[in-house]
From Swiss-Prot:
Cofactor(s) named in the record: Mg(2+); thiamine diphosphate
Ligand binding (thiamine diphosphate): 79, 120-122, 152-153, 180, 291, 373
Family listed: Belongs to the transketolase family. DXPS subfamily.
Designated name of the protein: 1-deoxy-D-xylulose-5-phosphate synthase 2
Job description of the protein: Catalyzes the acyloin condensation reaction between C atoms 2 and 3 of pyruvate and glyceraldehyde 3-phosphate to yield 1-deoxy-D-xylulose-5-phosphate (DXP).
Alphabetic keyword roster: Isoprene biosynthesis, Magnesium, Metal-binding, Thiamine biosynthesis, Thiamine pyrophosphate, Transferase
Record's catalysed reaction(s): D-glyceraldehyde 3-phosphate + pyruvate + H(+) = 1-deoxy-D-xylulose 5-phosphate + CO2
Cofactor note (record): Binds 1 Mg(2+) ion per subunit. Binds 1 thiamine pyrophosphate per subunit.
Length: 645
């Protein structure tokens, strides 16, 4: 274990106000110390490393120039917010990042007044910032609102919708484009820095405003010529910006995001200019800046487990079974080898969804559309219209962003699009913003859609094959984050019969009906109940839609107690089963039905097993539900012969 970094200047900082009297040289020292503190903290907790390292200087400069928290700084996505948390009074808890009861890995309104807007998903900052800017203006509050957004997030349409609105509204909003996909090249040198300072100065803004007013009075032909001349001139000196200018933004940049002597003057100029209308400052940074392993392999150090600071080697437990993501990726490649019509679509997550394997094997059949879930879904619908078999691989929480397209463009038209829904259920340290707990509720209500839920990796393999062969309409398969349970995966997985579940263990008296990941908890509960003399039947529903009505009716007829268990929110599988049982009159004869699902609240970051325990869907909760239904104490001895056979 390495010793804590030496941070004499940072040790004197209790909040952003303590940075405002510092010189540029002191700000540079503070940035170095914040970077060292962040590296050390993330080496202990794991988390998002590279993006935060890339914005250390920018973070220090922003809090130095702007009067936070009265001025608002909104961090898009939030991966990069660790330096911000260190500077805003949370340094003493920075080594609790993403731990149960500790700091969130994202910005969180209830955590600090310096977090004016919560994040986790991308491309929301400009919309939120514009709302805050207009809201403040209507209230008569003179404050600055700054939205910091990465170049990756600019691939989403929402960012441009917000910019279009901001340009038309002419509200005072500062957008900082954190461009970490460019190398720092000559355009970001001394001359560019000088021009950026000039273009952001109050005097230049005044001259330019006057010039625009004069041009507006010219005849149309002369006005067009003058505007075109200005575009050419600004393009030559700034290296770009015409697009943003056309959307109504005043463009400044690009500037070196790691040079405090470049950042501070530009930020101060923009703030002091007090210009009405939005401004975009183009800042070029390097992901992983200041930590060699992260600079050399930014993709591997975006999100990290615990690691050795000196070597950069991450601590990773030896896997006991392949991950569900890996199983999906492997099976999709196998299916694609047999059917040339299979293609895949991902929204900027080829590695995270396992599609990198397909991209390597069949690069022409794998499409990464960027952070654009809405487009991804409708693009896949178009592919299906032309006879292809598209698999759209998204995290459950990100599928929410394309829900209207699922309904309107796919399901309504019965197009055979396959949805591979990764990270279904609790996701642990990423918390509420990334939890995949709503998809069963929002997909289960849609006509024409088949929804499968994998209980283990072998079931997932069969579901990939099932989806590949399903051409009569849309179909979804959902599966959790992390490793499988260790079951053997068949060499040649066979498709499932649509809408048919399975009995996993025969018993009597009590039936446990699980869907998806909760099957293992049901089996664990059986072991606990066996010590009480109970031998429950265990069934795996496999399908949310259409669920196996024959199986449910059989379980209801043969048992006194039916416990339905899902790792999903209210309105999902439990609701479907309960409604059907009631409408069929199968609850009229005294069947004791209990529904175990995720309660009606959000669950913050913690270990997945802790989240399941808190939600009341783990083995102990299932055991308790059975005993309560039978009106038995946990220590009671069961007369198994008295139960319904």
């Amino acid at each position: 274990m390495t010793s804590r970094p030496i941070t004499p200047l940072l040790d004197t900082i209790r909040g952003p106000s303590d940075t405002r009297g510092l010189s540029v040289a002191q700000l540079e020292q503070l940035a170095r110390e914040v970077r060292a503190e962040m590296i050390d903290a993330v080496s202990v907790t794991g988390g998002h490393l590279g993006s935060g390292l890339g914005v250390v200087e920018l973070t220090v400069a922003l809090h130095h120039v702007f009067d936070t928290p009265d001025d608002r700084i909104i961090w898009d996505v939030g991966h990069q917010c660790y330096p911000h948390k260190i500077l805003t009074g949370r340094r003493d808890r920075i080594r609790t990042l993403r731990q149960g009861g500790g700091l969130s890995g994202f910005t969180l309104r209830e955590e600090s007044p310096y977090d004016p807007f919560g994040a986790g998903h991308s491309s929301t900052s400009i919309s939120a910032g514009l709302g805050m800017a207009i809201g403040s203006a209507l209230a008569g509050d003179a404050r600055d609102v700054v939205a910091v957004i990465g170049d990756g997030s600019m691939s989403a349409g929402m960012a441009y919708e917000a910019m279009n609105n901001a340009g038309a509204a002419k509200s005072r909003l500062i957008v900082i484009l954190n461009d970490n996909d460019m190398s720092i090249a000559p355009p970001v040198g001394a001359m560019s820095a000088y021009l950026s300072r000039l273009l952001s100065s109050k005097s230049w803004l005044s001259i330019r405003t006057l010039a625009k007013e004069i041009v507006a009075r010219l005849p149309d032909a002369l006005e067009r010529t003058a505007k075109r001349a200005e575009e050419y001139a600004r393009g030559m000196v700034t290296g770009g910006g015409t697009l943003f200018e056309e959307m109504g933004f005043y463009y400044v940049g690009p500037i070196d995001g790691h040079r405090m002597d470049h950042l501070v003057p530009v930020l101060r100029n923009v703030r002091e200019a007090g210009r009405d209308g939005p401004v975009l400052i183009h800042v070029v940074t390097q992901k992983g800046k200041g930590y060699a392993p992260a600079e050399n392999a930014p993709d591997k150090y975006h999100g990290v487990s615990r690691f050795n600071v000196v070597t950069g080697v991450q601590e990773k437990a030896k896997p006991q079974a392949p991950s569900y993501t890996a199983v999906f990726g492997k099976q999709l490649v196998a299916a694609a080898a047999k059917d040339h019509r299979i293609v895949a679509v991902t929204a900027a997550m080829p590695g995270g969804t396992g599609l990198d394997k397909l991209a390597a094997a069949y690069p022409q059949r794998c499409f990464d559309v960027g952070i654009a879930e809405q487009h991804a879904v409708t693009f896949a619908a178009g592919l299906a219209c032309e006879g292809l078999k598209p698999f759209v691989a998204l995290y459950s929480s990100f599928l929410q962003r394309g829900y209207d397209q699922v309904v309107h463009d796919v399901v309504l038209q019965k197009l055979p699009v396959r949805f591979a829904i990764d990270r279904a259920g609790f996701v642990g340290a990423d918390g509420a913003t990334h939890g995949g707990v709503f998809d069963m509720a929002f997909l289960g209500c849609l006509p024409n859609l088949v929804v499968m839920c994998a209980a283990d990796e072998a079931e997932l393999a069969r579901m990939v094959v099932t989806a590949a062969g399903h051409d009569s309409g849309p179909i979804a398969l959902r599966y959790p984050r992390g490793e499988g349970v260790g079951v053997e995966i068949p060499e040649d997985p066979q498709p499932l019969a649509i809408g048919k579940g399975r009995i996993v263990r025969e018993g009597k008296g009590v039936a446990l009906l699980s869907i998806g990941t909760r099957l293992q908890s049901c089996l664990e509960a059986c072991e606990i109940l066996a010590a009480r003399g109970l031998t429950p039947t265990v069934a795996d529903a496999r399908f949310l839609k259409p669920f196996d009505e024959e199986l449910v009716a059989d379980l209801a007829a043969r048992h006194e107690v039916l416990i339905v268990v899902e790792e999903g929110a209210i309105g999902g599988f439990c609701s479907h089963v309960a409604t059907w049982l009631a409408n069929q009159g199968l609850l009229d004869g005294g069947l004791k039905l209990r529904a175990l699902h995720i309660p009606d609240r959000f669950f913050e970051h913690d270990a997945p097993e802790v989240q399941c325990a808190k939600a009341g869907i783990d083995a102990q909760a299932i055991t308790t539900a059975v005993l309560d239904a039978l009106k038995l104490e946990t220590s009671a001895t069961i007369d198994a012969g008295a139960l319904k056979a």
